[in-house]
Amino acid sequence: MHLITALVLLLQLIHFITSSPIPQEVVGGPGPVVGGSGIGNVWEKANEQAAEQQNIGGPGPVISGSGIGDVWNKANEPAEQQENIGGPGPVVSGSGIGNVWEKANEQAAHQQSIEGPGPVVSGSGIGNVWEKANEQAAHQQSIEGPGPVVSGSGIGDVWNKANEQAAEQQNIGGPGPVISGSGIGNVWEKANEQAAEQQNIGVGGPGPVKSGSGIGNVWEETNEEAASMQA
């Protein structure tokens, strides 16, 4: 009787092992995927089947404050060919991601038809997020600097006054863009003390600031220059 029970358990174990799928590379790494409404376990189907990872539609690429790491084996192999993404909204990451979706990249110019250097970006796509904002995006998103203000669910008409003078206000250097899920929040203590002069923004919002290598009180010198540029 015990022998029969043992054989049954052994057969069940063999069946479980042989029927289990080979685990694929999941989205992970040092930086989280950023989205306004949250993305969670982003693409179950994509993580399960590597071959279908490139069938993901949507207007925007994956975003991470400090990079996602090796997102997908195949996409991350040829480093020299990873960055050929068209459209105004590039793949944004502190350490870069690479050529993520072949199909999405072929149609990137259409998918990313948002004016300005700071596009709407989302891991699984947002759609036409701001009807009014997109119509006037060239004026609203005219922000200079190495990284655009990015939000998973969009920022909308971010700072009326600030965007009019964005070229002077946002001339901030550094390794990574300012990224927020649904706003910017309490950015830099020192900078926020002078925010009324520098950016005319109300400090607050639910989304923390993220950057490729962290921000903290990041660039004192550029913040000092921002105040002088507004003078």
Curated annotation (Swiss-Prot):
Residues 114-123, 143-152, 177-187 have a biased composition (Low complexity). Residues 107-126, 134-231 are annotated as: Disordered. Resistant to heat. Sequence repeats lie at residues 28-56, 57-85, 86-114, 115-143, 144-172, 173-201, 204-231. The keyword Transferase does not apply. It comes from the Eukaryota. Keywords: Allergen, Repeat, Signal. Residues 1-19 form the signal peptide. Residues 28-201 are annotated as: 6 X 29 AA tandem repeats of [EG]-G-P-G-P-V-[IV]-[SG]-G-S-G-I-G-[ND]-V-W-[NE]-K-A-N-E-[QP]-A-[AE]-[QEH]-Q-[EQ]-[NS]-I. This is Allergen Ani s 10.
